[in-house]
UniProtKB/Swiss-Prot annotation:
NCBIfam families: gltX_bact. Catalyzes the attachment of glutamate to tRNA(Glu) in a two-step reaction: glutamate is first activated by ATP to form Glu-AMP and then transferred to the acceptor end of tRNA(Glu). Its EC number is 6.1.1.17. The keyword Ligase applies. It comes from Oceanobacillus iheyensis (strain DSM 14371 / CIP 107618 / JCM 11309 / KCTC 3954 / HTE831). ATP binds at K255. This is Glutamate--tRNA ligase. Belongs to the class-I aminoacyl-tRNA synthetase family. Glutamate--tRNA ligase type 1 subfamily. Monomer. One of its GO terms (molecular function) is tRNA binding. Keywords: Aminoacyl-tRNA synthetase, ATP-binding, Cytoplasm, Ligase, Nucleotide-binding, Protein biosynthesis. A motif ('HIGH' region) lies at residues 11-21.
Length: 489
């Protein structure tokens, strides 16, 4: 790259970190680090009606949780601050004054009702609604009259005539807009706060932003920002617009979509690992060379190539996310898996927060049984249900297993073996399977399936000898005895 790469993620503190925003931040982070550049966080907080208390802190908290580290930002400072737009209002005023001096900005006193009436008339005439320029050249007398009426003006940018705005999008290639597509647009609202496109262009220039990677919904904002760059004689950054994220039904991912969790906080609370989320999100609209999908952050930084950003919409595949998180759980230290899962058993009321050491060790052993199956921490509650239920029931498939003619003999012999065990541990229990097989002559599914169903109520499950040990001698013998009595054995 001919100049230092400087990219920014610019969240608005309007709520929690959304999947789409997390992807924008992550791609900018990978882009910056791949090219040994700088990753900047700039808070765009001028819309006080939409700002949420704690919104900025929440965004930064979950960016950090994902593993992103920034080089400049409101929380750590930097050479090109301040990094909150509400702290830069004097800067915007300075450049607004310059636009007035160049006759590139003017006051517009039209009310919202007047503007809507104008748009409606254009629609009725088959035109695309845009500002007509009605207040483009007001006389001093007209301005005085509007001021006397108490009207508050907005300030509009005077869009140049017969001008073409072209940029080579990093994702989509050449994109062109004509100035005639736009009416004079508002750069400062009636409350004196600069609009998004005006403030962003100034910030991007002053912060020396080299590249802007963002969602495709910003494509139409790009020519407006280019107008501001042109007005001051500045070089615009390179732009790249990522495709939409769709749900599994190929519809745009919406915050109102109840079938997909939308916020990073929700995934953390459910027991997803941050490195799994980082890996998964990195593949939403970008693909590496080859078939491999599992990458560390360091590997992604090394291989990230903006030319491989997809021109097709990304699909948020929940099954793939669960698969990927499971892969990370299987590779994690057991202590970390326990820390991930145990709080969910406590939250569900299965265990007490002040459990004794013996109970905690038992719970850790139970969790270890499901390490290979666990897709996210909260799933441990469902997976381990058999260890917390007092009574077990049998579905039709299980009943069919128990109806086998060999079952009473298998269960009776196995029960007798367990009764006489001195040490009720998995190794000793495992040996009783072999002893039961030797005594009854039954092997394979005819031996193991009846014992599994009788002791756990399930057709499938974790390592059976260890599960039997953890369920405990009393529970297991009671279950076997009850079932044998029902069979008349």
């Amino acid at each position: 790259m001919s100049k230092e790469v400087r990219v920014r993620y610019a969240p608005s503190p309007t709520g929690h970190l959304h999947i789409g925003n997390a992807r924008t931040a992550l791609f900018n982070y990978l882009y910056a680090k791949h090219f040994d550049g700088k990753f900047i966080i700039r808070t765009e907080d001028t819309d006080d009606k939409r700002n949420v208390e704690g919104g900025e802190e929440s965004q930064l908290k979950y960016l950090k949780w994902l593993g992103l580290q920034w080089d400049e930002g409101a929380d750590i400072g930097g050479e090109y601050g301040p990094y909150r737009q509400t702290e830069r209002l004097d800067i915007y005023q300075e450049y607004l004054n310059e636009l007035f001096a160049k006759n590139l900005a003017y006051k517009c006193y039209m009310t919202e009702d007047e503007l809507e009436a104008e748009r409606e008339e254009q629609r009725q005439n088959g035109q695309v609604p845009k500002y007509s320029g009605a207040h483009r050249d007001l006389t001093p007398e007209q301005i005085e009259q509007f001021e006397a009426e108490g009207r508050q003006p907005s300030i509009r940018f005077r869009v140049p005539e017969n001008t073409t705005y072209t940029f080579n999008d990093l994702v989509r290639g050449k994109i062109t807009f004509e100035s005639s597509d736009f009416g004079d647009w508002v750069i400062v609202k009636k409350n004196g706060i600069p609009t998004y496109n005006f403030a962003v262009a100034i910030d991007d220039h002053l912060m020396k932003i080299s590249d802007v990677l963002r969602g495709e919904e910003h494509i139409s904002n790009t020519p407006k920002q280019m107008m501001i760059f042109d007005a001051f004689g500045w070089e615009a950054p390179r732009y790249g617009h990522m495709t939409l994220i769709l749900n599994e039904e190929r519809k745009k991912l919406s915050k109102r979509d109840e079938h997909i969790l939308q916020f990073i906080e929700q995934y953390r609370n459910l027991g997803y690992l941050p490195e799994a989320m980082f890996n998964f999100i990195s593949l939403l609209g970008w693909s590496p060379v080859g078939e491999e999908e599992m990458f560390t952050q360091a590997q992604l930084i090394e291989i990230f190539d903006p030319e491989r950003l997809s021109t097709s919409a990304a699909i948020f595949d929940q099954h793939k996310l669960k698969w990927m998180n499971n892969e990370y759980i299987k590779a994690a230290d057991l202590d970390r898996v326990i820390d991930l899962a145990l709080p969910h058993l406590i939250k569900a009321g299965k265990l007490s927060e002040d459990m004794d050491d013996e109970t905690r060790q038992w719970a850790e052993n139970v969790i270890s049984l499901y390490r290979e199956q666990l897709r996210y921490g909260a799933e441990i509650v469902e997976l381990t249900e058999l260890f917390f239920q007092k009574e077990i029931s049998y579905d039709e498939e299980a009943k069919e297993v128990l109806n086998g003619e060999q079952v009473p003999e298998v269960l009776q012999v196995f029960t007798d073996k367990l009764i006489h065990l001195e040490s009720f541990d998995k190794d000793a229990i495992k040996a009783q399977f072999k002893a039961t097989q030797k005594e009854t002559g039954h092997r394979g599914k005819k031996l193991f399936m009846p014992i599994r169903v009788a002791t756990t109520g399930q057709m499938h499950g974790p390592e059976l000898p260890f599960a039997i040990e953890l369920l405990g001698r009393d529970i297991i013998l009671n279950r076997l005895d009850k079932l044998l009595k029902e069979m008349g054995a």
